[in-house]
């Protein structure tokens, strides 16, 4: 293993549990602490990326461009990054983000849809940005299929391609196999982004590092979607124990998590019943509320609905499947009850 580059995404992935309510003052304090602690890249944007502030994804308290501008003004050494999802963010938002101070853009697609990112990588390169590709929900496809998608991003200009465990569904061998496959096939760097739904955020990140990952992600206090991400301060401590500290101030990150982030958190993300179900089923956390409503309507345990959605490999945008699945399960249960009655 080698010392990785760490990107802290408290101010992006952490925007989900914060309901996108970060303020300039909060961003200033967090960026200043991360920068002083030696974190080389800090991601700042709406949880769903540039232009995510909307009725569908949740409105931001403060414009993400204002937050980016604040972050850049307080970062003396760290680079400022933003997330961009094709279909949400456009050329206009990317250009504005550059004008406000981002130096890195992370372009995210479903792990089967890298081909929709070509224009986004092209523009990012024209604008002089470092570019990172995100293959989301990467647990859903085998390593060889992910290699094909990663090669597309590499050909479009990605400087690094990430395996992203969006649902927190991977086990350590899953993370290692996917990272190893990309390392063997690509000439650019490979990264890994963990979620903690099965309690494996740190473990999966270590497995990815053992497989050769060059870049990893974390959030202070684990503040991220679902059960949260690998905690930045924990990653720093573990890397230091392994002799792989890339220049991080372990105590400084512990203090930032404890005294700056913890007091503003609406709750502590952890693997509760709902989060575990998301990781176990391997589906997006956005399905959870819809599954609960459908379960109540049709008398089905929402966990059964989510597991079936995972079996069918439903992805974001296919929320309409939830009612169909609930109906199917209800009919099967009804048929089973009738058989018992006639038996």
Swiss-Prot record:
Single GO BP term: catabolic process
Q: Which positions fall inside the Pyruvate carboxyltransferase domain?
A: 4-254
UniProt-recorded Gene Ontology molecular function terms: 2-isopropylmalate synthase activity; 4-hydroxy-2-oxovalerate aldolase activity; manganese ion binding
**What is the species listed in this Swiss-Prot or TrEMBL entry?**
Chloroflexus aggregans (strain MD-66 / DSM 9485)
UniProt binding sites for Mn(2+): 13, 193, 195
Annotated EC: 4.1.3.39
The entry marks the following residues as binding substrate, namely 12-13, 166, 193, 284
Top EC class of this enzyme: lyase
Q: Which reaction does it catalyse?
A: (S)-4-hydroxy-2-oxopentanoate = acetaldehyde + pyruvate
Superkingdom classification of source: Bacteria
Catalytic residues (UniProt)? 16 (proton acceptor)
Site-annotated residues for Transition state stabilizer: 12
Please state what the protein is called. 4-hydroxy-2-oxovalerate aldolase
User: Keywords assigned by UniProt?
Assistant: Aromatic hydrocarbons catabolism, Lyase, Manganese, Metal-binding
Homology family = Belongs to the 4-hydroxy-2-oxovalerate aldolase family.
């Amino acid at each position: 293993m080698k010392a990785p580059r760490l990107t802290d995404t408290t101010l992006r992935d952490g925007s989900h549990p914060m309901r996108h309510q970060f303020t300039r003052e909060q961003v200033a304090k967090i960026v200043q602490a991360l920068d002083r602690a030696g974190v080389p890249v800090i991601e700042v944007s709406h949880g769903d990326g540039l232009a995510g502030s909307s009725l569908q994804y949740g409105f931001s308290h403060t414009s993400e461009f204002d937050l980016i501008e604040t972050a850049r003004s307080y970062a003396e050494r760290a680079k400022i990054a933003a997330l961009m999802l094709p279909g949400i963010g456009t050329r206009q938002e990317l250009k504005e983000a550059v004008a406000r101070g981002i130096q890195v853009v992370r372009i995210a697609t479903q792990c089967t849809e890298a081909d929709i990112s070509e224009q986004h990588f092209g523009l990012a390169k024209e604008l002089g940005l470092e570019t990172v590709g995100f293959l989301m929900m990467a647990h859903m496809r085998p390593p060889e299929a992910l290699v094909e998608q990663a090669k597309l991003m590499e050909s479009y200009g990605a400087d690094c391609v990430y395996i992203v465990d969006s649902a927190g569904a991977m086990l350590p061998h899953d993370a290692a196999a996917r990272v190893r496959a990309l390392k063997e096939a690509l000439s650019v760097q490979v990264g890994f982004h963990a979620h903690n739904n099965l309690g494996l955020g740190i473990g999966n990140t270590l497995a990815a590092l053992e497989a050769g990952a060059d870049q990893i992600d974390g959030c202070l206090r684990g503040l991220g979607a679902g059960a949260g991400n690998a905690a930045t301060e924990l990653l720093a401590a573990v890397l230091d124990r392994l002799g792989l500290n890339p220049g991080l101030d372990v105590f400084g990150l512990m203090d930032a998590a404890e005294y700056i982030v913890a007091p503003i958190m609406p709750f502590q993300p952890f693997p509760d019943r709902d989060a575990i179900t998301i990781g176990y089923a391997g589906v997006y956390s956005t399905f959870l509320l819809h599954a609960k409503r459908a379960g109540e309507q049709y008398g089905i345990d929402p966990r059964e609905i989510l597991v079936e959605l995972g079996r069918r490999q439903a992805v974001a945008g296919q929320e309409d499947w939830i009612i169909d699945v609930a109906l199917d399960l209800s009919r099967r249960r009804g048929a089973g009850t009738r058989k018992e009655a006639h038996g």
